[in-house]
Regions:
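Aromatic- and Gly/Pro-enriched helix-to-coil junctions and flexible linker segments
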Residues: 38-174, 178, 187-188
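WD40-repeat beta-propeller superdomains and closely related acidic/aromatic-rich repeat-like regions
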Residues: 141-491
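N-terminal leader/targeting signatures
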Residues: 14-18, 44, 389-390, 481
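A broad helix-preferring feature
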Residues: 32-36, 297-300
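N-terminal secretory signal peptides that target proteins for export/translocation
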Residues: 1-20
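Short linear motifs centered on Gly/Pro in flexible linkers and helix caps
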Residues: 5-9, 40-41, 313, 422
Length: 491
């Protein structure tokens, strides 16, 4: 399941060595701006992370972020902020605001020099905060000066959703409750809970990220919620399934979190983002146990192996990376979606991954005509070394293929007890046997792209959601449609 991505205003200004023009770049942090800063008492030092970083990220990172660096200057991390651009002029000189190019540019009267260009100047209180922070020694009060600032900022304070949605919104994530009687649905700044058989709204869990990409209802009273705002912000949090109380924000990201997972023993959590990043946590830890950036494109999904040994991340870069669940160390790379020989050849983005407890195999899917069924240990063995490259090229490999019959990309995948559910841009949901590789049933009724599929833990129901905001629930025994509803309160 995926949706989202990065954005940036890449206006061209090659003649300027350091510019701080406004762009719709990486994260801005709602609720942490100048209003709170204005309340800071004069006796207190200015906090870089709480007061200065949100201003710089909001107004400057579109042209000076990790992906775009006008004038050779970046400020997405503190070490980059403190470095000079192509001009060689120090952006920040600790204790000397008058010698700092950053302050000179944001206060310049010449419109060709003042930054951000082609946008309103920074407010006087914002300029004063930055100047005071430099005067006080330009101290860093985050965790790691080399890490992106957006991954270290305090979690956002999210707004409430409208009481009634003016329009239906796409539903990108669904999940059954452990007893199979309710369905959690990703909404706009909220998670909504519905009766599975009637489609009746039960309750709303408010003040969540703008877009909900992944839900894991792993115990009756708690849901793992992941999402964010495309190109700006990502978040993974543990939320009460009853009240919506946020019990813990595990981490923030510099882009949308597209997938999250909980290990079967509920001791570990993993997540992946559109910022090419994968992270792992211990359930009781306050910080991530590991972080990995081994993908070259969006991380679209993650899954744990049944024994908890591995975390597997799927990506638009056409690979799946197998990580050690405890340390994050790369165990192997699965290249089965870049197959060069045989029936299912091609190079395909991967949008979903799931683990089957019965066969102890991973299933992955995205573009292309088949679901891949494979094993991490065998994949590593087949990767071999450069010395046996020619031999490996002509080997069929251990991967098995489930022809899914879809003509377009597959976004949703859920696997339980030897049965795989999949759906995508064709607007159809199908059920497959992992053992026989055969199609067992087709669930019809979706009116547009399917983004997410889910099977009830009891095995009685299956569900799907998609672009038009509908959730459909079928009886698994006979494929009959039980209910369908627009999961937008008030619609």
């Amino acid at each position: 399941m995926f949706h989202g991505g990065s954005s940036g205003d890449r206006a061209n200004d090659a003649g300027r060595k350091i510019s701080f023009r406004f762009g719709l770049g990486l994260a801005l942090v709602a609720g942490l701006g100048v209003t709170g800063a204005a309340r800071t008492e004069a006796a207190d030092d200015v906090s870089f992370m709480r007061q200065v970083a949100p201003i710089l990220l909001k107004r400057c990172s579109g042209c000076h972020g990790r992906r775009v660096s006008e004038g050779g200057y970046r400020l997405h991390a503190f070490t980059e902020l403190m470095s000079a651009g192509e001009s060689g002029e120090a952006a920040v000189v600790a204790g000397k605001p008058e010698a700092s190019e950053l302050l000179r540019r944001i206060t310049a009267s010449d419109k060709d020099l003042r930054m951000p260009q082609e946008d309103d100047a920074l407010a006087a209180i914002e300029v004063a905060l930055i100047k005071r922070w430099i005067s006080e020694g330009a101290r860093f009060d985050g965790r790691d000066p080399g890490r992106p600032l957006t991954s270290q900022l305090p979690p956002r304070q999210h707004p409430r959703s409208p009481a009634r949605y003016p329009v239906a919104i796409p539903v990108l994530a669904i999940e059954f409750s452990p007893d199979g009687t309710q369905i959690a649905v990703g909404g706009y700044h909220e998670v909504t809970i519905w009766q599975a058989r009637t489609g009746k709204l039960v309750r709303r869990l408010p003040k969540r990220p703008q877009r909900i990409q992944s839900l894991v209802w792993y115990r009756p009273d708690q849901i793992l919620v992941a999402g964010g705002t495309p190109g700006e912000y990502g978040e993974v949090a543990l939320v009460s399934a009853m009240s919506g109380e946020v019990r813990r924000v595990l981490g923030t990201f510099d882009d949308l979190v597209l997938g999250a997972a909980v290990s079967d023993d509920a001791k570990r959590i993993a997540a992946g983002s559109a910022g090419h990043e994968t992270r792992g946590w211990s359930m009781d830890a306050t910080q991530a146990a590991w972080e990995s950036r081994v993908h070259s494109d969006w991380v679209t999904g993650v899954a744990f192996s049944a024994d908890g040994r591995f975390v597997v991340s799927a990506s638009r870069d056409q690979t799946l990376k197998v990580h050690d669940a405890a340390s994050g160390a790369l165990f192997t790379t699965y290249n089965g979606h870049r197959k060069q020989l045989g029936k299912f050849t091609g190079r395909f983005a991967v949008y979903a991954v799931s683990f089957d407890k019965r066969s102890k195999r991973l299933l992955s899917v995205g573009e292309g005509k088949a679901i891949r069924v494979w094993d991490p240990v065998q994949a590593r063995s087949e990767n071999g070394t450069a010395a046996d490259m020619e031999g490996r090229f002509f080997k069929a490999g251990h991967t098995r293929f489930i022809p899914h019959g879809f003509s377009k990309a597959t976004f949703g995948l859920d696997v339980h007890d030897g049965v795989a559910l999949a759906g995508g841009a064709d607007g159809v949901v199908r059920e497959f046997s992992v053992e026989t590789l055969e199609t067992r049933r087709t669930y019809e009724g979706a009116s547009d792209w399917v983004y997410a599929v889910a099977a009830a833990p009891t095995g009685a129901l299956v569900a799907a959601s998609g672009f038009r905001g509908e959730v459909l629930v079928w009886n698994r025994a006979d494929g009959r449609l039980v209910t369908r509803f627009v999961a937008s309160p008030g619609r």
